[in-house]
Amino acid sequence: LISSTLAVQDKVRDQRLIMHRKVKPNPAIFVQNSSTAISFSAGNANLWIENSYVGKGWKLGSCQIITGIPENDWEISLPDGICLDVVPMGENGFVARPYGLDDVFKGALNSPHTMFTGIPFTEWMEQRGLSTDDFRGRIDDLQAAPVFPLTESVEELGVLLRWMTTEPDLAEGRALWLNSKKFSADEISARANLQR
């Protein structure tokens, strides 16, 4: 996605020649239909933000895709390679779907070869005090496993995303995740309310 768009759009090598007040500090930064209250730097290479609100409390890295984020006042810091997708579900719900840029979404949850947010899923569970017993449904394949929580609160959504990505000791995030209805990546694709 990012490399293809860069190949099509990056025709000017010297960004200073682009007569625009907000020259991109890196040609591989793409912001589509979004509101951003942060400043970008050359370190934000390979960044795609679409249909999202990225507030002043956000810190982004590189190699990231950020999509569907509702208006928020979160304090969130994402390391390189961590992506966020928020999917509207039902009339008022949001499903939090973080992932690693290179995750392939396949493999059993208890396999050390199944990657999630750029680390083995077994390590992700261990960091958060979870086991496969905490999943209600399929655990034989990450694509079909109910990993992604539903919430109707934007504030809770931010807590869930922080817990699922960079703050595994966040007790509130763990409690929210354990008590939420969860969907698999397959279910999200089938049930998303894209008209919202």
At which residue positions do the language-model features occur?
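Left-handed beta-helix
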Residues: 1-196
